[in-house]
Amino acid sequence: MDRLKQAFREFNEERDWDQFHTPENLAKSICIEAGELLECFQWDNNYDKEHLCEELADVISYCVMLADRIDIDLEEIVLDKLEKTKKKYPVEKAKGISTKYDQL
């Protein structure tokens, strides 16, 4: 994750784009790019893998930049969230079903 953060810092500093990367703008960009990612599946599942990868990279890029901007350890919060989700969906109750946790 540190390599990604550093690469984005350098890229943005070279272009003087940090001024535009407010938390609000980065959050908006995540939503916009997530919409573009969803478009890959709009009418069927016959997606172009290269295009899908580009859109997924855009979403992840903005997530990394937002986390860096607001000084959040992205790896830590994702792993913490996974632990919480494991508790909500214990294997013995959730395996093989898609029922929401409050209805297990």
Description of each model-found segment:
Residues M1-L56, I60-L104:
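Flexible "arm" and connector segments at domain edges
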